[in-house]
Amino acid sequence: LEATFGNVAGLAFTESTELIFSRSNYLMYGNNQSVSNINTFGFSQKMGESSVLALSIMSMGFGEIDITTENIPEGGIGTYSPSLTNIGVSYAKEFSNSIYGGVTLRLISEKIYNLNSSGACFDAGIQYVTGSSDHIRFGVSLKNIGSRMLYGGDGLSFRGNAEEGDYFLTISQRSNDFELPSLLNIGLSYDLPMLTEDHRVSTSGTFTSNSFQKDQFRLGLEYAFRELVMLRGGYVYQEEVTNSSYEATMSGLCAGLSVELPMGSSKFGIDYSYRDSKVFQGTHSIGVRIDL
């Protein structure tokens, strides 16, 4: 189900029914404070022998922020709470033993005080699995391909003095539309040969072409013991990342841990991950999964 974020084609590997919930403290600072809290929920269901349908919801909140104006810059006149919400519907299919594909339609809503914007986009991906034991995987995905977005609302209007005459006018401003940050991912993973099936070591690499920032390279390593405990580590490299004037906020090291707890024919999983950041104290994420 997590594949709906990276490469939706991976959703086709869902065996039955899966539920997931996660919470991320994005860019920690101070005393356990964060710039934003991100809550995600997902549900996937296998349909027939080769198709999977999924629903995903992401809500990003920034807490309460003091309202300030030119005349009252110190605040004290109320607060507002910006929010971003994405709702996606995904479909993935197993075309053969080697080829998997999927697509996601996503609705986007952004609100900042008395301004709001909405739009729609889609993601698409394909995966190719090969090797004597399906130990080589290649994937390509496109994300955030959609319409331009535009902010509107009462926040674009204000009361001003007329140039001639002793009265006020309501003045409306126009906002400029903007593109979504589309990107292209090309990835490859390889399972190293092991002496026993109790252990698995997988390596992966991904190239990301971003529309509004420099391209990125990602390297990952995962160790699994009996597919019950998984340890992961990774590194995100970006051109000129060693120059503090150009480095991205989210680059460098990352790590994660997953534990699968069998419950009869079902599984209960716990996930944790940490991503390093250059300015703040990193991003912590924790999630739970249920496979029915």
Residue ranges, per PLM feature:
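Subset of outer-membrane beta-barrel
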Residues: 1-292
